[in-house]
Regions:
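N-terminal Lys/Arg-rich, disordered targeting/topogenic segments
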Residues: 1-27
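Hydrophobic membrane-insertion alpha-helices, especially the h-region
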Residues: 34-53
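Short amphipathic alpha-helical coupling segments at ligand-binding clamshell hinges
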Residues: 198-209
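Short, well-ordered beta-strand elements
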Residues: 60-70, 95-99
Length: 213
């Protein structure tokens, strides 16, 4: 009985559709098929969006963090795109920049912002989304006390000869490197590579890049 009833309904609908013309015919088609059409459109959108994300997704080849320092547009370009070009990277590869991190309270950063920065920094390290840190003297001392950085000499034996390296080999003064010197920072700028850096070889290449003439 159920099968006969469904067949009759389908035939009735077809007969109705044949009797309609013009706009009413299209309105009937839309009323009858709008749900399946909507489902198909949603599926097409999801598949298209997934394909778009796959094609345009960037690969992060180095994670760079700025702590207690701010880079202008020119320096930011040199620290990110400039390095990517020097390395001959593809357009789908990039340096991921984590900026705006402040570990000391000032007129521009209240206690809550400093706390949020600390959590953001800790989260990036825990998730292995941080390689190189550029920082001021205060941030250097804070992060050194928390044993954030590895010995840079383990990345490249030639780093033993760097004059700006601290006694432990964990922090490098990069204030006199070409890009940083041109930026005109009021204080010294330091570099460290975190202990669990996901791209240590790229971090070593980054240090060489900063010292290039």
């Amino acid at each position: 009985m159920q099968y006969t009833r469904n067949t009759t309904m389908t035939k009735t609908d077809r007969d109705t559709l044949r009797s309609l013309h013009g706009r009413k015919k299209w309105e009937h088609i839309w009323a009858y098929y709008k749900l399946p059409l909507a489902i198909v459109l949603i599926i097409v959108y999801i598949l298209g969006y997934a394909a778009y994300r796959h094609v345009t997704k960037k690969e992060d080849v180095l994670y760079l963090g700025l702590v207690n320092i701010t880079a202008g547009s020119d320096l930011t370009e040199q620290l990110t795109t400039g390095f990517a070009e020097a390395q001959g990277l593809t357009k789908k590869q990039q340096v991921d920049l984590l900026s705006g991190l402040l570990l000391s309270e000032s007129e521009h950063a209240e206690e809550q912002y400093v706390y949020a920065s600390e959590m953001k920094l800790l989260g990036a390290v825990s998730a292995q989304r941080l390689d190189v840190v550029l920082m001021d003297e205060y941030a250097r001392d804070r992060l050194l006390a928390d044993d954030y950085f590895l010995d840079l000499r383990t990345l490249d034996a030639s780093f033993h000869a760097l004059s700006g390296l601290n006694a432990g080999g964990t922090v490098l003064d990069i204030s006199d490197t070409p890009f940083v010197r041109q930026a005109g920072f009021s204080g010294r700028v330091y570099l460290g590579v975190v202990q669990n850096a996901p791209h240590p070889e790229r971090a070593a290449a980054y240090i060489h890049y900063l010292f290039q003439r």
